[in-house]
Amino acid sequence: MDLPPLSLDQLSAVITAGPTPTDLYTSLSAYEEQACLLSATDPSEKDLLLEFYTAFFFSHLLTDQICEARALTRRIPREISRLDAMQTCSLLLRAVWQSKHTEIYKILRELPWPGRSQPLVQRYESYFQEKTLVEMSNSYETIRIAAAATYLGLDPAAVEGDIIEKFTACGWKWDSEKQLLHPKPVVTAPPKDDSLQNELSRVMALISNQGS
């Protein structure tokens, strides 16, 4: 089956179809050759190429292909790589590489992104929070409220009781005497077991009420 031509409408259809991260990556990978040819033959398609490469970049992050994302930034046509959104992608990649959580949330939430990529920006923020939650749960025996909030992009200055409630609702324990949270370890479920994903989705629904 022939691949439909790359266009803004086709790109939107791929992004909004709600595929898994792997499906999204595979679908966008198939268009990289078309994008490369467009950049060489039709400079007027700059907006399309910017949207495509931004979406393709996020498909790498959503599948945790950080090294491959770095390689992608080196393949992007020079005239596109110089655009603001591509520079922002590079900033985000550097922050992810260096595990600078506060900077990651700031870039995702405060810097401008191409319109069609907004769903992927939000999707990656949720993915990064889920991933960070698992890492915290399995790396810390105890953690202070402010640190836990910062890792998940919550406002450490928010009402302490609200933050505590969000974590205890996820199975964490609160030691009021020592002012410490005790994370609940997350056991990685088998691929066909949706229990871990369901728990993470519940967690993200809880913390999303905190806002940015």
UniProtKB/Swiss-Prot annotation:
Specify the protein name: COP9 signalosome complex subunit 8
UniProt xrefs under Pfam families: CSN8_PSD8_EIF3K
Organism per entry? Emericella nidulans (strain FGSC A4 / ATCC 38163 / CBS 112.46 / NRRL 194 / M139)
The top of its lineage is: Eukaryota, Fungi, Dikarya, Ascomycota, Pezizomycotina
Residues in the signal sequence: none
**Can you tell which superkingdom this protein's organism belongs to?**
Eukaryota
Query: Self-association or partners: how does it assemble?
Result: Component of the COP9 signalosome (CSN) complex.
Q: Per the record, what is one GO cellular component?
A: COP9 signalosome
What is the protein's known function?
A: Component of the COP9 signalosome (CSN) complex that acts as an regulator of the ubiquitin (Ubl) conjugation pathway by mediating the deneddylation of the cullin subunit of SCF-type E3 ubiquitin-protein ligase complexes. The CSN complex seems to link protein degradation to sexual development.
Which ranges carry the PCI domain? 26-193
| Example GO BP | COP9 signalosome assembly
Q: Which family does it belong to?
A: Belongs to the CSN8 family.
Q: Where in the cell is it found?
A: Cytoplasm; Nucleus
Where would you say this protein principally sits, based on its record?
cytoplasm
Q: Which gene encodes it?
A: csnH
Entry keywords, A to Z? Cytoplasm, Nucleus, Signalosome
Matching InterPro entries: COP9_CSN8, CSN8_PSD8_EIF3K, PCI_dom
